[in-house]
Each structure stands twice: as structure tokens, then as C-alpha cells.
Amino acid sequence: MPYPANVREIRAPRGTTLNTQSWLTEAPLRMLMNNLDPDVAERPEDLVVYGGIGRAARNWEAFDAIVAALKRLKEDETLLIQSGKPVGVFRTHADAPRVLLANSNLVPRWANWDHFNELDRKGLMMYGQMTAGSWIYIGAQGIVQGTYETFVEMGRQHHGGNLKGKWLLTAGLGGMGGAQPLASVMAGTACLAIECQPSSIEMRMRTGYLDAWTDDLEKALAMIDESCASGTPKSVGLLGNACEILPKILELGRLPDLLTDQTSAHDPVNGYLPEDWNVEDWKARRLSDPKAVEKAARASMAKHVRAMLEFQRRGVPTVDYGNNIRQVALDEGVADAFDFPGFVPAYIRPLFCRGIGPFRWAALSGDPEDIYRTDQKVKELIPDNPHLHTWLDMARERIKFQGLPARICWVGLGDRHRLGLAFNEMVASGELKAPVVIGRDHLDSGSVASPNRETEAMRDGSDAVSDWPLLNALLNCASGATWVSLHHGGGVGMGYSQHAGMVICCDGTEAAARRIERVLWNDPASGVMRHADAGYDIAIDSAREHGLDLPSLKG
């Protein structure tokens, strides 16, 4: 539920001057503020970072209280955050997390949007999404490589590895979906991305994630045709409503080469524009008549999925990109809604089996050169991965930093801790101007239970078992992460996921090195453990290769 907007402009401090008692508390302070940087957040005035109503703090009073608490927090104290509000400071020890966050968690019987929204209206909860409430969102770059890897794998499986002259049709250009146009172009294919909010298109144009836009379907298709004919991939934003435009494209007989969707369908009230509604009426009625909005949005999503199914029937490779739109359509009577797969079981799970996932870091100095130096260090430490090197080169060339300079690359067990230790040494030697923080998306190998996304179609049927993210969070606390978060409902909405996050600060000290080695080994190892337990041979082999002690693993 929106709170009164605040006109303050929040940006993270830069440089080496501390505003807190140590770098271990300066790091969460800067990353909290970075989440609300106007170049990062979708609606910073409302504390909304991305993903519909994913917030960094419950309200502005809570934000100010968090900042004040972090500034006075001692090296042996831990701050507790309950759904975006600071609720306690307790004495722990120097290797304990400095901040523990629990966001949007509800007892399962009450884990639905109606109950959450009631609590939100009363000021008792907030929706943390994944990296909004856990203070490690880095702008659209945070999802670019995962999206790029998915599109590359789609091209490999469906088009012989060559996407030249092909085009992708999708929708949604918010904080997550906004990565699609750039990821598509980087993967070598043109992209037509439908978006209903002009502000989101403007944001993607301003940050370099979108090449062009129009509000005319014929012009958009003409630009796509020109791109495909030239063999030079281009991204085109189309202002409109996906549930209206996809059927029109079908009527024209135009078939894309790939199809997906990243609208905010996880939130039927705040995330999806109903058919034949304008944005202004939608925003007003979200407050005055949310039930009517939800009913209309759900019907529109069903129409959207029916169109996707028809594209699939006509031979277009079609994939759900994790926004729960298939589930809504199924609930609305689309019996075959799950006939097209989710992206994780279709393309990503083999990576998860090896603990490979979205490894990200941010330079607290604010100096882009710190990121460029770490890019080079990654290449030095992982010399035999040309795909990774290509990614880093493309990222430097194509990705504009939003807020504090940051980088993401997908690496796994055996590499993450080596990179963390190297970054820490670079801080200690002065090669980096200030500490860096290392974190990840909650979408990772061992940190999420989400039966319609990350854990869809698990081999042993354990899709809904959420012990795993709880164990991941506990393990990261015990290992010494700088802050640890446990959330509910990210990506797919209330009742459909539980997930955990961690961030570790590399401040150049020997104590940090010990924590880094534990955290950045144990965190991906828990993902290998989870998949080995589910019976995946790749994960079992990885566990044995890395000497993991898994008592239930036979042989």
C-alpha cells in the first residue's frame, strides 16, 4: 500500500569517509541508500525499488530509524529488521551478521495477498521482493546475465546456437523485466518488449537497456523486421498492454522466434494492467477498489497466457520467466496453462546443480575503476572460461552503472570464495579505493523454494519443501555473512515462495578473509547439497568433486 511520498533524494555516500562505526555497518547503510537512488529504484519517493511494490523500508519513518541505528551500531551488535522496520539491537559478537532481516513472512494459512495487503494497509508489513528489502539490488544489471544465459540456452536448444536474424517477443520492462532487451541483444537476437507504463520505457531508454520505442505496433514490427534483415540485433519497446497486443500479433500471422514474459503478474493488484484500462484509472482504482482491479487483471492474464499457448502451438519456443502468470491463468480456468515450461527446469537447473548462480558485487568507493579492476581479477582467476570473459567484456561495453558501480557474473562453488578472497586482498593492498560488498539474488542454487519457478519440477518431487532456504539462511548466519535476509513471496507473489539472501563485506582485514572463505564456500555448497539430495547426478558428482560432507549421500 503506498505511503505518502517523500521528496528527499537518497544516494549512497561515496569515498572512504565513514558515516558509521565500521565498514561492516557502513556497507549495509550504503547499500540501503543505493537501493533508493533515483537511478536505481523504480519509485524511490515511495521506497519502491522494483517488482510492483518491493520496498527497501516499510515507510520513511522506518528508513530514518534504520539509518540512525546503523550509524550507532557497534562491532559486536546486530540490528534486527522486521518487514522493513528496525525492531531491535542485540549484543552478539564480531563475526555475527551486523543485520538480520525478515521480510513479508506469513504463516502459510494466511500467506496470501488479501491478508498481506490488510497488514500492509495497517503499517504492519512490507513486501521485500528479493533484493529490494535485503538491500542488494544493483539495478537491471542484477538480472541481465541470468536473462542472457537463458536466451543463449534457448538459442542453443531451439535454433542451433545461432540467433542472428531472429527475434524475441516479451513484455514487462520493470526492474527485472527491464533487463530483457539488453540481454536479448547481447545474446544476438532482436527484441520486441511490450510495456504499459511510459515511465518504465523512459527508464530503460535512459539507462541504455532499450534501443528504441514506439506506441505503434506496425512501426515496432517494421523496426524488428529491419533488425532481423540486417542481422544486427536491436531492442524495441512498444507502449501498450501485452494481453491486447499478443492476440493482435497472432492475427497478423507474425511469429517470433522466442517468446516469454516478465510483467509483474505476481501481484494482480499492483503489477498487471487490466485489458482496456488506462494507467491512470488503474492506479486510482488500486486504492479505491482493489478487488475489482484484481478480478480484471486475473482475467487479462488468462487471455495473455492463452495467446502464449497459441504461439507455442504454432511452433514458437515459449517459456515462463518466473512471474507466476501460468498459475493465475490456471486458477482462471486455463487448464493447459502449464503446457509451456518455466525457465529454470528448461534451461538453468544444470547450473544450479553445480552451485553456479548470480554472484554480484558493488564498489562502496563509488569509483567505476574499482569494478574494472575486479573484472580483470575475475579473468585472471578463472582463465579457462571464455564464455565468462565474453560476458565481462560485453558488460563493460554495454551496461551502464546505476547507483554505486557494480558487476554481476554467474560463478559457482569453488570460484566464489576465491574471488571474494582476492577482492579482499585488493582492498587490503589499496588496489581498490574502498571495500566492496559481495551478494547475490535470492534466485540461486540453494536459497529458494518456489514450486512455480526455481524449484519447479524437481526430480524427487520436493518442489514445495522450504526447509532448504531456511537452512541456507541459518548457515550464512553461522558462517559470518555481514547481513542475512529471509523473505516470502518474491518473484511469484504471496504464498508461492520462500527465499534467503546474504551479503558479505570485503573490508581488507584478516577477519573478513576468514568470514569470506566460509560464507562464499558454504553458500553455493548448500545449493549443491540441495540438488544432490533431490537426486541430480550433476550435483552428486559436484559434491564428490568438492569433497562435501553429505551424510545422506550414498556411495
Curated annotation (Swiss-Prot):
Query: Which reaction equation describes what this protein catalyses?
Result: 4-imidazolone-5-propanoate = trans-urocanate + H2O
Predominant cellular place of this UniProt entry's protein: cytoplasm
For this chain, one GO molecular function annotation is: urocanate hydratase activity
Q: How is the cofactor bound?
A: Binds 1 NAD(+) per subunit.
Write out the annotated subcellular location: Cytoplasm
Entries under HAMAP family matching the protein: HutU (MF_00577)
Q: What is this protein called?
A: Urocanate hydratase
What is the name of the gene encoding this protein? hutU
